[in-house]
Amino acid sequence: MTNTLVSTSKFLSLILRHAPETIGLALDANGWADVDQLLARAASHGNAISREQLDEVVARDSKTRYAFSDDGLRIRANQGHSLAAVDIGLPPAVPPAVLYHGTASRFVASIREQGLRPGARNHVHLSATPDTAVSVGARHGKPVVLLIDTAAMQAQGQVFHVAANGVWLVEAVAAAFITFP
């Protein structure tokens, strides 16, 4: 993506995941925003985005962070929200027996003590492949991949969801379900 598209994607991430109020935008309970309102409010706050740019960001985003509604009139982030009022309405899903979590090595000691918590987000994010987890962990420093025993978690009643982009979501992961390198 060009620098302009990367900037637009970062702006969308802020607005659709964390702070729609910064441009006076309201998300519905499932995280959807009206596209016309998003574009108008963004422009009125100095971030002019054309519909063509928006379409291109959504289409070219390698992590499939955003989705349009079937009619193309609404947009939302597929996961990663920190807004407590947003429930993107994903049904429970049965994960593979093992999923992966990518993190930076400097966080491993804390995770050993506390497990994985969502922090400022609504869910802990898990990856289906070790390669994806490595790339996630590398964003924050020297990557470490943790193995998550999702079969044991499910046996104890934990509920999983899978976002449209393949990211697995769960409320938290106790350290007992994590295999550390």
Please place each PLM-identified region on the residue numbering:
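Conserved NAD+-utilizing ADP-ribose enzyme module
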Residues: 1-124, 128-181
